Design a protein with these regions (language model features):
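Alpha-helical transmembrane segments and membrane-interface helix-loop junctions
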Residues: 1-174
Length: 174
């Protein structure tokens, strides 16, 4: 097998891996969003029906929203759902367009690296502190940054590979 065929095989395996990871992230986000709804409903029922609102429900809902958002942001990067300046890029000559799109994805990947690193630093710093309403480490607030950052780097790399190969990343929800 020649080098080009090997590269194509690795590239397609990586694309399939990223597509599955993106689908898994979407499914997990949906499950977590349902958990947010249940948590908020439990709080409302507790407050208005039983006259005793559970103290943990709001804190859990806020925590879950962070995870849903982090997963959604990462999937948005893969599926090109993030804000972009398409009109300016489309006016450029083809040779410049490719270079600019690669630079954009490198910037997004750099952001993902910084976000993941910062999240990790804060998670390790806050590991010994407990969230009073949930009795879990404060670190759980920063883990979504790590997860989203890693996913953003993986998905940005997928876009760069696709651009260099002259391909497009197909959204995972297709």
């Amino acid at each position: 097998m020649n080098m080009q065929a090997q590269a194509l095989g690795i590239s397609s395996k990586y694309t399939r891996f990223c597509a599955q990871l993106s689908k898994l992230s979407l499914m997990l986000a949906v499950v977590l969003l349902l958990a947010v709804i249940v948590s908020v409903q439990w709080q409302v029922i507790g407050r208005y029906v039983f006259n005793s609102s559970p103290t943990w429900a709001e804190a859990l809902a806020m925590l879950l929203v962070m995870y849903v958002t982090a997963l959604g942001v990462a999937v948005g990067v893969r599926d090109a759902g993030h804000i972009g300046l398409e009109s300016i890029v489309s006016l450029l000559p083809e040779s410049w367009r490719l270079k600019l799109e690669v630079v954009i994805h490198l910037c997004v990947a750099t952001f993902g690296i910084l976000m993941s690193y910062s999240g990790w630093v804060w998670a390790t710093l806050k590991w010994d502190e407990k969230k009073p309403m949930l009795s879990v480490p404060e670190s759980v607030d920063y883990i979504p940054l790590v997860i989203a950052g890693v996913l953003i780097v993986l998905f940005s790399a997928e876009h760069i590979i696709a651009l260099v190969r002259g391909e497009e990343v197909v959204p995972s929800w297709n």
